[in-house]
Amino acid sequence: MRRFTVTLFLVFFLVAPAYPMTVEEAVQHALGHNPDLQALRLEEGTAKGLLEKARLLLINNPTIGGNISKKDKPEEEGGGAFTNYGFKLSQEFEVAGQRGSRIAVAENEFDRVKAGIKDRERVLISEVKDAFTKVLALKKKNGLTREIVQLKEELLGLTKIKFQAGDISGLDVNLAEVELSKAKRDLLLNEREYRESLFTLQGFLGLSPDRSFALEGDLPSEAPSLPDRAALQEAAYAKRPDARATVFEVEKTKAALKLARKEVIPNVTLSGFYDRDELRNVVGLEISIPFPIFDRKQAEKKEAHAKAEGARIKCDGQKKTIEREVEQAYSDLAAAIEELTLFKKEIIVKAAENLNLLNLAFKEGKVGFFEVRLAQKDTIEAQVAYIEAQTRTQLAVNAIEKTTGGSLK
């Protein structure tokens, strides 16, 4: 009884359960737990802090100063000592509208950072969907490879029986053994590739390798409809966050160039002071303006102009890049749809049924070993090609959604 209790404890508490997960759940988990995305989101707080600073009414803090001194009186004035002291309060003011330009720079930077975060989410969603698709495909290939191993084992058993009966030669038995060894090797390779794909998916999801989960879903069995190419281009320009980010960068550099030009105009410093000595009290105002003779922000203006021109060029290049990506994704989807339509699920099922009938005919001696071997090869190749066509179709759909920044559904 005690041993039974310990066994139950191990089953329920030490064996990690496999959590079911759909592709939608995987995407949501990645958006909430991916470490790279979490680190990138912190940049929004930095940009928000810079915006708050830019909105300050006065960018410079006031300055307060003071002085104190002691002085001896002449003997003819009675001797002794007296103390002089004074205070001065200064404030620097911008008079060329630099605050408005500074706010424009910070606002566009804040919007650019938010768009950059959205763009990283767009890319992450595509990466998760691609990894999810590859895991499903390898899982399906693993199942097929196990069936192939079982099929080869059955064929080897039949060949040994027929060899003992004198119906076939030893060469056929050797070929069957070689085919079985190759099938087992393929199974090991597929299982290793499947584990590696799971680790990749876990990395995108922010999960530790010891976290066990079971993927729910299947590869597409029917070809999706091909969307309109022009509509895809329009959707990409309108929805993609990286397109908006380049626009915000252009506006930011324009505002920065205006700010550099305004900073040539010197700031005005106003000061109020109070001085006291043994004879009088003095209260007054003081104004100071630096002369921009040597430093006229030449380097800052050149730097801002270069950045503005670079941002404009990058924005134009981004449009062409998006156009190429949409064209490539559209072509890949069209090719994948055409390939998938060549396969019908019913045909694949019938091919497997025909193979079973052929194996039965071989067992009864109606067909030879090489006919069965050739039929197995053709059926296996057709099933593998069908899985690969399904995989390419789903990856093409994922690419379309990535390039357009939306969903085809």
Predicted regions and their residues:
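Positively charged n-region of N-terminal signal peptides that target proteins for export
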Residues: M1-F4
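Bacterial N-terminal signal peptides
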Residues: T7-A16
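Periplasmic alpha-helical coiled-coil/stalk elements that build and connect Gram-negative outer-membrane
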Residues: M21, I117-A235, A329-D332, A336, ...
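A small-residue-enriched
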Residues: Q28-E94, L207, Q233-K302, E309, ...
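Amphipathic alpha-helical coiled-coil segments
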Residues: A39-A54, R120-E147, E153-L156, I161, ...
